[in-house]
């Protein structure tokens, strides 16, 4: 569903369950994290039920959940590339018009220091005119979707 629809669903759910409106953002983050890190076939009602169970046990527990919309929104629906990393790669290339995306993979680390490692493999022309294949890895802030740093391969 579109982001606005998801926000409306969460607001309606929170109201229906009698949860304070001030907790709506935490519920949204919980729903975002679960739906992005679990099975694609999950139903929002089930996921929000899990969030509600967590909330009933400890209302503060949802404060650790992360809204992954910014991170998720930076992936291209066309080729799966991670746009902020692709932009940095092209900016550092000899001939950015030779850039050809091959693949992008990511690994989420959702601990006390939540971030993602995003790796993009691409082809491009080097300074000598030869086509080379390279992989660049970056540490990404999952809250903002921005690249924090390029990692050594």
Task: Label the model's feature ranges.
Residues 1-153:
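Cystatin/cathelin-like cysteine-protease inhibitor module
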């Amino acid at each position: 569903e579109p982001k606005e629809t998801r926000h409306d669903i969460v607001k309606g759910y929170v109201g229906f369950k009698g949860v304070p409106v001030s907790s709506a953002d935490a519920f949204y983050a919980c729903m975002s994290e679960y739906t992005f890190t679990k099975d694609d076939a999950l139903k929002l009602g089930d996921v929000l039920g899990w969030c509600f169970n967590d909330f009933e046990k400890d209302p503060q527990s949802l404060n650790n959940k992360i809204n992954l919309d910014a991170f998720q929104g930076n992936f291209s629906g066309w080729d799966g590339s991670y746009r902020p990393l692709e932009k940095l790669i092209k900016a550092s290339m000899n001939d950015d018009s030779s850039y050809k995306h091959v693949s992008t993979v990511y690994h989420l680390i959702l601990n006390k220091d939540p971030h993602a490692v995003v790796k993009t493999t691409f082809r491009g022309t080097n300074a000598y005119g030869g086509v080379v294949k390279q992989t660049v890895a970056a540490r990404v802030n999952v809250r903002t979707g921005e690249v924090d740093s390029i990692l050594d391969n």
